[in-house]
Amino acid sequence: MARALITMPATAKRGDVIDIRTLIAHPMETGYRPGADGAILPRNLIRRFTCHYDDVLVFSAELFPAVAANPFIAFSTVAIASGTLRFVWTGDNGFTQTETTSLVVA
């Protein structure tokens, strides 16, 4: 399991725009680069990132080989009600990581 960091407010007022920042430790190996022994390193990419606010998709991104290792993704959404945000990274070789964070809306 990769280390994921999610930075966002724990509380917000209804209608506030909240900024969300995510970072995941991942090599994002393109499959084009030779290793120390000269053999091509196998491709290992995160292909898709999604964020659901309760069950509503609020952000998604497709990632490509040009994305650097440890991809940082920042986006905003509107706080509408208390709930859970679910962050999902999916990639090559069956890689899937899911993290959740709660948001309390007053």
Task: Tell me the role of every PLM-derived stretch.
Residues 1-13, 18:
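Short, compositionally biased P/S/T/A/G/V-rich stretches that sit at domain boundaries
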Residues 17, 80-84:
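Extracellular Ig-like/FN3 beta-sandwich strand-entry sites
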Residues 24-41:
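Short amphipathic, basic-aromatic surface patches that mediate peripheral association
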Residues 37-57:
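Extended low-complexity, serine/threonine- and proline-enriched intrinsically disordered segments
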Residues 66-73:
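Aromatic sugar-binding surface patches on proteins
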Residues 83-91:
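Short, aromatic- and glycine-rich surface loops/edge beta-strands on solvent-exposed regions
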Residues 90-99:
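Short acidic/polar inter-strand loop motif in beta-rich domains
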Residues 102-106:
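Short beta-strand edge segments in extracellular beta-sheet folds
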